[in-house]
């Protein structure tokens, strides 16, 4: 593997999951790698064992002798002394995704994009490949117990990458298979309009070479609109719309889903998933479609899907007392994701009382999607709304925007038991009161609500909640 005359590569933020995986791949490819991070630990120690030079903290001297500097999205470019020093010295400074795109040129790239379902579909494809005897390189934006984390640096030709549309990052990648799992309004701070977002996905599909393939879900109206604009071969999949790869006879019970796949005229019955929800059937169809393009035997693909055991924070059951009291933790933060997660709970656990505990993520998203959240949450038996998790935003820039906007929207949509609770301690106390047999507390959000879910589960395990 060569990157021109590049020999030494310095990585700012090397301890992050995505950056450490790139560092490991570069080391295995024979490059000299150095990197810095504010914190060091097990991940950076492992890289050091492989030959990386690791610096704790940032200093202009760390870039001395390097040919290129790579930085992650978590690093503020205009505030980092190493990046500033590199720019002054005329050393190229690039984002993680550009380096990843260059590395993909030496592999068979399988890139999974879409507004929703990226993480799960990427993990499903990785599981299928590994169960089929392949050794792929995998980078996922979540943690898989099957994979032993979020990244795998394999020896084989396949590179399976979760490809984020935020900040147009996925346009730096070089896929042979480009998978578009879903498409609707999101990241308007990057795109401004839905049309611009669709144009970005078309450009992503155009990154595929003439011998590659685009795989897309026709159950999404906006994807159906862009299909006539695709300039590459494509495969369609779906449940509701006619497609090349379809699912039928879907039966859901608790954490198990059984269905039939019909692919290009062939029928495969008894496909089993150990995760709930119609949305995961669509994710499985996406993975199966990719496997068919790779000419892997359908029987191996189905067996691989059966080995998929889920992702952390994707309907992760953190506690189950065997009498119906459950704590479930999910990353859902877009209305469609929330709707799919609540539906999975209601369909799979029909006898349970579903208590949705939702933490809105970003003030801008709360303002834009309040009504949609209302409809998505209204099917739950009871709804508790927490304060907005601000992430990169500041409350003073969004006067009057809070979780109560969502609570009111749930009531308008027909929700009967709805609370907006301010303050972490008050929320914790209310949640403890709901810990009764037959109740599923379904925590959803991309913020720190996950810590409340794990904390409550731990309290239940050690008997401190009665």
Swiss-Prot record:
The pathway entry for this protein reads as: Cell wall biogenesis; peptidoglycan biosynthesis
Annotated GO biological processes are: cell division; cell wall organization; peptidoglycan biosynthetic process; regulation of cell shape
What is the protein's major site of localization?
A: cytoplasm
Binding positions for ATP per the UniProt entry: 114-120
Q: Which reaction does it catalyse?
A: UDP-N-acetyl-alpha-D-muramate + L-alanine + ATP = UDP-N-acetyl-alpha-D-muramoyl-L-alanine + ADP + phosphate + H(+)
Q: Which Pfam families match?
A: Mur_ligase, Mur_ligase_C, Mur_ligase_M
Q: What does this protein do?
A: Cell wall formation.
- UniProt-recorded name of the protein: UDP-N-acetylmuramate--L-alanine ligase
Its gene name is murC
């Amino acid at each position: 593997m060569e990157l021109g005359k590049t020999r030494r590569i310095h990585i700012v933020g090397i301890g992050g999951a995505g950056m450490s995986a790139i560092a490991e791949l570069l080391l295995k490819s024979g490059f000299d790698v150095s990197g810095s991070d504010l914190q060091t630990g097990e991940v950076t120690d492992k890289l050091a064992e492989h030959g990386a030079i690791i610096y704790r903290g940032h200093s202009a001297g760390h870039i001395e002798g390097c040919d290129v500097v790579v930085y992650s999205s978590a690093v503020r470019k205009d505030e980092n002394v190493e990046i500033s020093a590199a720019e002054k010295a005329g050393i190229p400074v690039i984002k993680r995704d550009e380096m990843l795109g260059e590395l993909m040129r030496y592999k068979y790239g399988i890139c999974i994009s879409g507004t929703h379902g990226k993480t799960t579909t990427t993990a499903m494809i990785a599981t299928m490949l590994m169960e089929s005897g392949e050794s792929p390189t995998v980078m996922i934006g979540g943690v898989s117990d099957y994979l032993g984390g979020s990244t795998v640096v394999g020896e084989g030709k396949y590179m399976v990458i979760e490809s984020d549309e935020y900040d147009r990052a996925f346009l730096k990648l070089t896929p042979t298979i480009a998978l578009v799992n879903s498409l609707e309004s999101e990241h308007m701070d990057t795109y401004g309009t839905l049309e611009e977002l669709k144009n970005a996905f078309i450009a992503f599909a155009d990154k595929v070479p003439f011998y590659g393939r685009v795989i897309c879900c026709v159950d999404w109206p906006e994807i159906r609109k862009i299909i006539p604009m695709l300039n590459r071969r494509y495969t369609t999949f779906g449940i509701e719309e006619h497609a090349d790869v379809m699912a039928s006879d879907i039966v859901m019970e608790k954490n198990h889903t059984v269905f039939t796949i019909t692919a290009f005229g062939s029928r495969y019955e008894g496909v089993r998933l150990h995760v709930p929800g119609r949305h995961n059937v669509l994710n499985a169809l996406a993975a199966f479609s990719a496997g068919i393009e790779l000419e892997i035997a359908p029987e191996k693909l189905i067996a691989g899907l059966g080995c998929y055991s889920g992702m952390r924070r994707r309907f992760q059951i953190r506690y189950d007392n065997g009498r119906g009291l459950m704590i479930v933790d999910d990353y859902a933060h877009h209305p469609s994701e929330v709707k799919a997660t609540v539906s999975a709970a209601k369909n799979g656990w029909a006898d349970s009382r579903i208590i949705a505990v939702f933490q809105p993520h970003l003030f801008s998203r709360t303002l834009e999607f309040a009504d949609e959240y209302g409809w998505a949450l209204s099917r739950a038996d009871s709804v508790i709304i927490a304060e907005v998790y601000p992430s990169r935003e500041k409350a003073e820039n969004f006067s009057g925007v809070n979780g109560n906007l969502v609570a009111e929207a749930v009531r308008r949509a027909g929700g009967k038991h709805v609370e907006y609770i301010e303050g972490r301690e008050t929320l914790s106390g209310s949640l403890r009161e709901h810990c009764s047999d037959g109740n599923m507390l379904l925590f959803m959000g991309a913020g720190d609500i996950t810590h409340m879910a794990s904390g409550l589960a731990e309290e239940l395990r050690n008997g401190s909640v009665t």
